[in-house]
Amino acid sequence: MKQMDAHQIISFIQNSKKATPVKVYLKGDLEKITFPVDVKTFITGNAGTIFGEWAIVEPLLEANKANIEDYVIENDRRNSAIPLLDMKNINARIEPGAVIRDQVTIGDNAVIMMGASINIGAVIGDGTMIDMNVVLGGRATVGKNCHIGAGSVLAGVVEPPSAQPVIVEDNVVIGANVVVLEGVRIGEGAVVAAGAIVTKDVAPGTVVAGIPARELKKLDAKTASKTEIMQELRQL
């Protein structure tokens, strides 16, 4: 999938059909109800479950109050513009609780851990691990064989469309709770220490830390050993 630019994302959101899907558990004299074709029904006898848009389901419930003994509604979004990514055929390990929106690219053998939030237009390279509760903003790009530590935020940019996204090159290790501001590029093989706030580009093969992040040293054998990417964790 080719990465979307900001104008394409804006157009996608603008022109998408906004959705408020609901799931409703029903019981009552349901055989007397005529369900619209846009409502999916899974009903046996006097109980069942239906799926549909709230704009269709709400008047249906109101019109059939006499035939419905009770119901419970589940709803998790309102006028949502971007569906979640269909993950069934992605060649990666994606753990429960990750929230990944449509139009995201995920490379082979990538790992997305619990609680990660990945916005539209983001790109994750082959073999990269996105740890727990990481936020990848719109159009954020992470290269191959990286590790983005738990709780880190890679700022997204959809508006203004002229802004540049965060770019993380290959073989980068970012510690926990790091914030990378929009437009920053982190060079290949760099290491960003936990808790850093990265406000400017990071040179390849360097180690940075602090608020704001500053270069501490060139990557040496000791640091490389401590930040080694383990391919065993990426096997499917």
UniProtKB/Swiss-Prot annotation:
<keyword id="KW-0028">Amino-acid biosynthesis</keyword>
<protein>
    <recommendedName>
        <fullName>2,3,4,5-tetrahydropyridine-2,6-dicarboxylate N-acetyltransferase</fullName>
        <ecNumber>2.3.1.89</ecNumber>
    </recommendedName>
</protein>
<keyword id="KW-0677">Repeat</keyword>
<dbReference type="Pfam" id="PF08503">
    <property type="entry name" value="DapH_N"/>
</dbReference>
<comment type="pathway">
    <text>Amino-acid biosynthesis; L-lysine biosynthesis via DAP pathway; LL-2,6-diaminopimelate from (S)-tetrahydrodipicolinate (acetylase route): step 1/3.</text>
</comment>
<dbReference type="GO" id="GO:0047200">
    <property type="term" value="F:tetrahydrodipicolinate N-acetyltransferase activity"/>
</dbReference>
<dbReference type="InterPro" id="IPR018357">
    <property type="entry name" value="Hexapep_transf_CS"/>
</dbReference>
<dbReference type="Pfam" id="PF14602">
    <property type="entry name" value="Hexapep_2"/>
</dbReference>
<keyword id="KW-0808">Transferase</keyword>
<dbReference type="Pfam" id="PF00132">
    <property type="entry name" value="Hexapep"/>
</dbReference>
<dbReference type="GO" id="GO:0019877">
    <property type="term" value="P:diaminopimelate biosynthetic process"/>
</dbReference>
<dbReference type="InterPro" id="IPR050179">
    <property type="entry name" value="Trans_hexapeptide_repeat"/>
</dbReference>
<keyword id="KW-0220">Diaminopimelate biosynthesis</keyword>
<dbReference type="InterPro" id="IPR001451">
    <property type="entry name" value="Hexapep"/>
</dbReference>
<dbReference type="InterPro" id="IPR011004">
    <property type="entry name" value="Trimer_LpxA-like_sf"/>
</dbReference>
<dbReference type="InterPro" id="IPR013710">
    <property type="entry name" value="DapH_N"/>
</dbReference>
<keyword id="KW-0457">Lysine biosynthesis</keyword>
<dbReference type="InterPro" id="IPR019873">
    <property type="entry name" value="DapH"/>
</dbReference>
<comment type="function">
    <text>Catalyzes the transfer of an acetyl group from acetyl-CoA to tetrahydrodipicolinate.</text>
</comment>
<dbReference type="GO" id="GO:0009089">
    <property type="term" value="P:lysine biosynthetic process via diaminopimelate"/>
</dbReference>
<keyword id="KW-0012">Acyltransferase</keyword>
<comment type="similarity">
    <text>Belongs to the transferase hexapeptide repeat family. DapH subfamily.</text>
</comment>
